[in-house]
């Protein structure tokens, strides 16, 4: 009998402090519905579900016919399951890490280096940069999902410099004036001026940052108490960030970066060197397998200011331009494909109405990981003897060139996300 190449996984949960608590967390809810024995602690955060082979959260195989305990062990001994191109391109490794995130309090403002810089940083400071890989990532909202992403249009930043004197004070008059003057210039002049402004902010003395932030918080609080709307300078968000990270330089970053609220199904793609921060909500995320992060604020952790200011992409764009749009499949009316301009990963979203009784997950020349977000099915493949029941929160590994038939066991809509590598 052929060894199974499609099998369910038990995946690692990360309980970082910023995660949503207990059953408020989509991560915890997915876990509870896929595993009847799972005990959800209501006083603990459930931040991330990791689906992949990362050493800090290698998925366990739930198939007693398979001798290997973890997905990375199995892939190491079944290399053809990756797909020939994936195996050759990524040295026999699964190139992506697939996740669900449930965010209650903001994550740090950060950017990820490109491959060239990652190699250099890893050599120079392996304690801060643990590998030599780049880390592009994509987030697709499951619930309304708020984040900061990329530099705003310069006109918006200039407006904040006028309306927020504390922000202008930290940037300095010279850099602020220069930014206003370059608004109509070419993109290189704008980028250079923007870099100068951002660097001035990031290199401000801690004491001065705390003073200016306290002035701003006091001003917003007084105006809000008097019944004035302060949303033109994101008053509510600033107070919230300051409460969570008092005196943190990152509180001022909201005046530099686009604020996005993604509706379910909307996505943002974060290429190398783009500053970003997740603020609140639940999402599916996929990324290249790396842990390299250069932080910029909203964090008690190490901030590498010189590297950050040097590496960032200072290309302004509007918030609507930061949305990453999927393409609808021509062959499959239920399938949307989020295919970013990097080779490491692609996400497929499948929405099947409950009135349909069966659905076929097509074979790909790539290993893939499938997550059931909604629905209940029985999965079978031409090579498996035993059908696999899957419900909300269920995770399935699908070897390259394997198709899977799903039989809906309830008349409820299906929502499925599948991470793969389309080379």
Swiss-Prot record:
GO terms for molecular function: mannose-6-phosphate isomerase activity; zinc ion binding. It comes from the Eukaryota. Its main location: cytoplasm. Its cofactor is Zn(2+). Binds 1 zinc ion per subunit. Coiled coil: none annotated. The keyword Zinc applies. Its EC number is 5.3.1.8. It is found in: Cytoplasm. It catalyses: D-mannose 6-phosphate = D-fructose 6-phosphate. Keywords: Acetylation, Cytoplasm, Isomerase, Metal-binding, Phosphoprotein, Zinc. GO terms for biological process: GDP-mannose biosynthetic process; mannose to fructose-6-phosphate catabolic process. It holds the Pfam family PMI_typeI_cat. CDD domains: cupin_PMI_type_I_N. Pathway: Nucleotide-sugar biosynthesis; GDP-alpha-D-mannose biosynthesis; alpha-D-mannose 1-phosphate from D-fructose 6-phosphate: step 1/2. NCBIfam families: manA. Belongs to the mannose-6-phosphate isomerase type 1 family. Isomerase that catalyzes the interconversion of fructose-6-P and mannose-6-P and has a critical role in the supply of D-mannose derivatives required for many eukaryotic glycosylation reactions. This is Mannose-6-phosphate isomerase. It comes from Pan troglodytes (Chimpanzee). The gene is MPI.
């Amino acid at each position: 009998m052929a060894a199974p190449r499609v099998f369910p996984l038990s995946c690692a949960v990360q309980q970082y402090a910023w995660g949503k608590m207990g059953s408020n967390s989509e991560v915890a809810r997915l876990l509870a519905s896929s595993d009847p024995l799972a005990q959800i602690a209501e006083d603990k955060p459930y931040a991330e579900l990791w689906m992949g082979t990362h050493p800090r959260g290698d998925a366990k195989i739930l198939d007693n016919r398979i001798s290997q305990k973890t997905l990375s062990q199995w892939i190491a001994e079944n290399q053809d399951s990756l797909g020939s191109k994936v195996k050759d391109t990524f040295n026999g490794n699964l190139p992506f890490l697939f996740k669900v995130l449930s965010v209650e309090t903001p994550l740090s403002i950060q950017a990820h280096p490109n491959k060239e810089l990652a190699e250099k940083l890893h050599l120079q400071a392996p304690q801060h940069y643990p590998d030599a890989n780049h880390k592009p990532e994509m987030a697709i909202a499951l619930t309304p999902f708020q984040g900061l992403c990329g530099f705003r249009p310069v006109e918006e930043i200039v407006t904040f410099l006028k309306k927020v004197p504390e922000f202008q004070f930290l940037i300095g008059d010279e850099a602020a004036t220069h930014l206003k003057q370059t608004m109509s210039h070419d993109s290189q002049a704008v980028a250079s001026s923007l870099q100068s402004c951002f660097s001035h902010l990031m290199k401000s003395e801690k004491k001065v940052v705390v003073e200016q932030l306290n002035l701003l918080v006091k001003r917003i609080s007084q105006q809000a108490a008097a019944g004035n709307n302060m949303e033109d300078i994101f008053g509510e968000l600033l107070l919230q960030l300051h409460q969570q990270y008092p005196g943190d330089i990152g509180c001022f970053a909201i005046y530099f970066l686009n604020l996005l609220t993604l509706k379910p199904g909307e996505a943002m793609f974060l290429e190398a060197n783009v500053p970003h921060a997740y603020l609140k909500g639940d999402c599916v995320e996929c990324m290249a397998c790396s842990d390299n992060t250069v932080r910029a604020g909203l964090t008690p952790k190490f901030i590498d200011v010189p590297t950050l200011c040097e590496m960032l992409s200072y290309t302004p764009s509007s918030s609507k331009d930061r949305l990453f749009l999927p393409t609808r499949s021509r062959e499959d009316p239920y399938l949307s494909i989020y295919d970013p301009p990097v080779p490491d990963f692609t996400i497929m979203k499948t929405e099947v109405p409950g009135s349909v009784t069966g659905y076929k997950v097509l074979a790909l020349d790539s290993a893939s990981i499938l997550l059931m977000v909604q629905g209940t099915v029985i999965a079978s493949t031409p090579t498996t003897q035993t059908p696999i029941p899957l419900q909300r929160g269920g995770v399935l590994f699908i070897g390259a060139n394997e198709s899977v038939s799903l039989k809906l066991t309830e008349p409820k809509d299906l929502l499925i996300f599948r991470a793969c590598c389309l080379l």
